[in-house]
């Protein structure tokens, strides 16, 4: 079976949670006999065809961008060719240009769609786009929500409830660096950041709530390590500098091996996203896989499907830096509680969020 995934960006051009989700779907279904390709845009699509372990990547040049939505008018012909090759086309929402691609050429093959997030910020543009979006979603054979929480709270998904299935995101642990590989970086990570710090990993975007995390870290007797880069990085560094946050470290992008070493030495994973743009939180899954307790905010999304308050970690009021600080203080002061919650998080990962389970569910969807 040949599946064509369609999304606006992918490795190696960008690194983020949604790219990782697509990678994990490809890896999980590969073990079920599925051959995947990813059709995506790139500012520099050379080479245009890039074989990777999980999938072959087909890149076309991005022509222009509006409100973070890339367009590639010259790539339509290549898209048609890839659709003809595929048995099923798997779209990843939101990306309005993919609506156009589907309506122009995608109706030739069965289509499914993973609904990763509502459009939260661009209300005016959403009002203009909505008629096309509803037509697009209405044509899908099935629509996948990544958590029961998001399905329950999304107006758009509830409008297509008869088409919706829930398949939680899963991670294939063997696709991550091994313990031996991670251990090669442990000494350097320990020397740079120490141990028992609070760890954030992700693209530094407005909805991640990192300004709230910096407010919570002020005067704390422990370190906060922020891994990643992104659009609001300069603002965050300025805030940390002005407020004299010597206990906050910006690590930038790191290798997968170093990232897993950072998970290994942290006290807990902190994930302060405060808007529904944060639909799931792959970092929370990586923390759970690493047997670490989780701290997240309640935004009515999949973050609270991964992190169960009082069991796998602590869930706080969104946007409340005092509540976030209290949660970090609790886990900083009680190693035993942190360890128990970390083990519970690992158990929940094993029961619900493995790559194998996700791969089996998507293979069943495709067939």
Where are the model-predicted features located?
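A conserved mid-protein helix/loop that constitutes part of the nucleotide-sugar donor-binding site
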Residues: 20, 24, 196-219, 231-237, ...
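Short His-centered aromatic/hydrophobic patch
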Residues: 91-98
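A short, active-site helix/loop in glycosyltransferases that binds the activated sugar's phosphate group
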Residues: 138-177
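Nucleotide-activated donor-binding/catalytic signature segment of Leloir-type glycosyltransferases, i.e.
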Residues: 234-257
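Acidic donor-binding loop of glycosyltransferase active sites
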Residues: 264-279, 292
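Short hydrophobic beta-strand element within catalytic cores of glycosyltransferases
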Residues: 289, 293-297
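Conserved acidic donor-binding segment of nucleotide-sugar-dependent glycosyltransferases
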Residues: 308-321, 328-335
């Amino acid at each position: 079976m040949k599946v064509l995934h369609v999304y606006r960006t992918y490795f190696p051009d960008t690194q983020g949670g949604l790219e990782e989700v697509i990678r994990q779907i490809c890896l999980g279904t590969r073990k079920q006999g599925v051959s995947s390709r990813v059709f995506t845009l790139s500012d520099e699509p050379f080479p245009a065809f890039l074989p990777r372990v999980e999938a072959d990547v087909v890149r076309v040049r991005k022509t222009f961008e509006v409100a973070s939505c890339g367009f590639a008018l010259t790539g339509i012909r290549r898209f048609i060719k890839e659709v003809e090759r595929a048995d099923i086309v798997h779209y990843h929402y939101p990306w309005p240009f993919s609506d156009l691609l589907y309506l122009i050429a995608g109706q030739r093959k069965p289509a499914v769609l993973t609904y990763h997030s509502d459009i939260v910020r661009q209300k005016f543009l959403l009002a203009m786009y909505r008629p096309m979006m509803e037509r697009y979603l209405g044509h899908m054979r099935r629509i996948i929500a990544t958590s029961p929480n998001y399905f329950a709270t999304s107006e758009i998904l509830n409008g297509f409830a008869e088409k919706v299935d829930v398949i939680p995101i899963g991670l294939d642990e063997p696709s991550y660096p091994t313990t031996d590989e991670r251990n090669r970086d442990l000494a350097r990570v320990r020397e740079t950041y120490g141990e028992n710090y609070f760890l954030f990993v992700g693209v530094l975007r407005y909805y991640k709530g990192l300004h709230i995390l910096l407010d919570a870290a002020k005067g704390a007797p422990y370190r906060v390590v922020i891994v990643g880069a992104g659009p609001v990085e300069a603002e965050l560094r300025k805030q940390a500098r002005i407020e004299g946050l010597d206990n906050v470290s910006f690590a930038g992008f790191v290798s997968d091996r170093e990232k897993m070493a950072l998970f290994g030495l942290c006290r807990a994973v902190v994930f302060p996203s405060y808007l529904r743009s944060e639909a799931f939180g792959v970092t929370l899954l990586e923390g759970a896989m690493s047997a670490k307790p989780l701290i997240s905010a309640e935004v009515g999304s999949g973050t609270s499907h991964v992190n169960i308050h009082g069991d796998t970690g602590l869930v706080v009021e969104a946007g409340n830096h005092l509540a976030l600080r209290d949660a970090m203080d609790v886990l900083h002061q009680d190693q035993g509680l942190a360890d128990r919650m970390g083990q519970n998080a690992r158990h929940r990962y094993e029961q619900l969020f493995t790559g194998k389970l996700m791969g089996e569910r998507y293979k069943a969807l495709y067939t």
